[in-house]
Amino acid sequence: DYHRIANIIYLGVLGNGERGPARWKNRFFERYQEALRFGDICAHAENEILTLLDMGGISCTVLESCGIRDLYHIHEIAANSPLRLYLDSESYSLAKGYLVDLGYETDRFYDGFGEHMKRVSGFEVDIYYKIPFPVRLFEKQMLYLLEHAQVRSTYQYVRTLPVEDQFLFRLAEAACHYVTDELLIRELLDIYIIYQAWQAQLNQEYIMKKLSDFHIDELAGKLVQISCMWFGTKKDAVFGLLPEDMGVFDVLENRMLSRGAIMKETDTQAACLLQLIQKEQDRERHRKKLERVRKKAKECWQRFTRRLSWIFPEYKYMCAIYPVLEKIPFLLPFCWIRRDIRLLLGMFR
């Protein structure tokens, strides 16, 4: 029951003022006020960013927008989620410059992917120069989906994904967050809301095929199903199928709610995905370690060459000290020795 009404808990606590602890009431009231303010600015701020990028001829693809708020019956219940944009490396730098001009500041970096920027008003934007997936397979499949992105109406350079591909992106991200114990209930709520709103429009055969390409068709189906069980009814069928073994969902629920503290994973796709992520992380750590070694070796070599050039200066410099070298160049080694001996004697005097 709690999970079924979790999306309206803020309003529920506000309406039960006598029994609710004061600290809870204050926090929920602050959260609700933030949601109200965000609702006033999000559409304008999003259009402002996209219009500016479009006028600058900067091509970008919208991965997520605040448009999901329109799918909630009460808009303030939706999360204050950021606008998420994917750009190529060249456009990324230009877009960041435009955002800085609009008053956005970098709040945190996504190592190897992009950064999170926010403005004092509260609106936030994520910009990526690389698809934010920790697995190469997911990145490759997502790049295929981006090829189907369509130009957004009223824009020339701003693209958006079809509804099926938007849903696939959220499912792929949720699968990654699940196996790394970072999946939030809010993400599942958004998936449920989207599935219920777009169910009639979704090409389920296409979605299942693409999920198979991601190798998460079974795992993604379970995540959508458990979101329906939490926020809808247990009778909701995902992709036309009803679950046979309800114990599977107890495993998912325990892992998600405990953030991995209670983990008895039985899903083979989840186990394989976790192995892939760990391999990518190991590969990235090895790459960074190798990069540090190369950087240190380069610095050592530069120090060595500087010392070497001090001991054995170039020919033109030596000619300025010993003009005879211009007529007899083969005396250069003897001049080096003579100069270095004089310098050493000068140090010991």
Predicted feature locations:
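Conserved NTP-donor binding/palm subdomain of two-metal-ion nucleotidyltransferases/polymerases, i.e.
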Residues: 1-81, 87-349
